[in-house]
């Protein structure tokens, strides 16, 4: 672990809690001259069918999901004070826990910042909290923001 952190990864999903996490991560990045990576991840819906009754092509589904993720990132960027911070963004498809952990490894993160609860109530009820799974499996220190 490196302190102060050189690279901070923050996961955003459009929820108020993830925005608070982004704000805190940006403050830490500014205070420590750290690089900030904002990531959003969406799990492709299983068995999703389009209005035609036919499954969408993987390309069409990926494009629609990525557009939604890009909007989440745009909103987070617009709502977060990123002045004076070196930062990047990433949008990915897959299991949020696995993808966020892989991003921490890929970016050589020193700190992961997440909101306590995300936007998906049903996912939390069925699969548990992403923050909880990250807390149990993160190879880097994790800051969970209420």
Please provide the spans of the model-predicted regions.
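Structural beta-alpha unit
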Residues: 1-4, 78-112
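Small/aliphatic-rich secondary-structure junction motif
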Residues: 2-55, 83-90
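Short secondary-structure boundary segments
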Residues: 40-41, 115-117, 146
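Short, hinge-like loop/turn segments at secondary-structure boundaries
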Residues: 53-57, 106-108, 130-131
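A short acidic, glycine-rich active-site loop
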Residues: 56-71
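Glycine-rich, Arg-bearing micro-motifs that act as flexible, cationic patches
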Residues: 111-136
């Amino acid at each position: 672990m490196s302190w102060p952190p050189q690279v901070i990864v923050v996961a955003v999903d459009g929820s108020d809690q993830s925005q608070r996490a982004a704000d805190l991560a940006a403050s830490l990045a500014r205070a420590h001259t750290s690089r900030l990576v904002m990531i959003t991840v969406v799990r492709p819906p299983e068995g999703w069918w389009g209005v035609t009754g036919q499954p969408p092509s993987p390309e069409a589904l990926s494009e629609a999901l990525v557009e939604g993720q890009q909007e989440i990132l745009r909103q987070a960027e617009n709502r977060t004070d990123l002045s004076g911070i070196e930062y990047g963004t990433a949008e990915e498809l897959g299991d949020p826990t696995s993808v966020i952990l892989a991003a921490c490894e890929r970016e050589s993160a020193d700190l992961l910042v997440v909101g306590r609860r995300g936007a998906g109530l049903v996912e939390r009820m069925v699969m548990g909290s992403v923050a909880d799974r990250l807390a149990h499996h993160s190879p880097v220190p994790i800051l969970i923001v209420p």
